[in-house]
Amino acid sequence: MRGRDEDTGEFRGASRSQQRREALEIFDLGEKLVALTPAQLAKLPVPESLIQHIEESKRITSHIAHKRQLAFLAKHMRREDDETLAAIRDALDANSDTARREVAAIHRVERWRERLLADGDVALAELLEAYPAADRQQLRQLVRNAIHERAKNKPPRAYRELFQVLRDLSQEQGLESGDSGLEDGESALEDDE
């Protein structure tokens, strides 16, 4: 109950500004939920009643009607207990962290590919030293073909195949957690910023 306590004179409950901030946070959470794909949404601990409102919000495309439907979704979300909303927020944060790590791993593989194309045998020797299971002949041939394709302005078939081989190597042997393929002075944290 809001208002002043008759005995002590202190205010009860959250202030109106605090309630408004909490309502806006829930509205933003609703927008994030509506932006998710059905597969992503299925992984979250969202109650069935909210899923119906989320799907309804996705269906409406008119700007004002969509915003009104989001407000309606937020109203229903405010009726949920705090633990449910906290679980949804935590799951969304975990999903975004996972996506960020996957993107960082892809960037590291791309840096290895560019290093192999720029430095040739020196970078290849470093890669093979760190990951002896890699196929030297296949990698050398892909690097040579990718350089040739780039010089002749041909479609980058070998360039893409080199990326796929490096990505498979990273998934098998943990390339993303080992040597990142960075030049001296570069920071591995650049991907996380």
Swiss-Prot record:
Highest taxon of the lineage: Bacteria
Gene: darP
A biological-process GO annotation: assembly of large subunit precursor of preribosome
Function: Member of a network of 50S ribosomal subunit biogenesis factors which assembles along the 30S-50S interface, preventing incorrect 23S rRNA structures from forming. Promotes peptidyl transferase center (PTC) maturation.
Classification via HAMAP family: DarP
Region (Disordered): 1-20, 171-193
Protein name according to UniProt: Dual-action ribosomal maturation protein DarP
SUPFAM superfamilies xref list: PSPTO4464-like
GO cellular component, one term: cytosol
Family, per entry: Belongs to the DarP family.
A GO MF term: ribosome binding
UniProt-annotated location(s): Cytoplasm
Keywords on record: Cytoplasm, Ribosome biogenesis, RNA-binding, rRNA-binding
Feature: compositional bias, Acidic residues: 181-193
Ranges of Basic and acidic residues composition bias in the record: 1-10
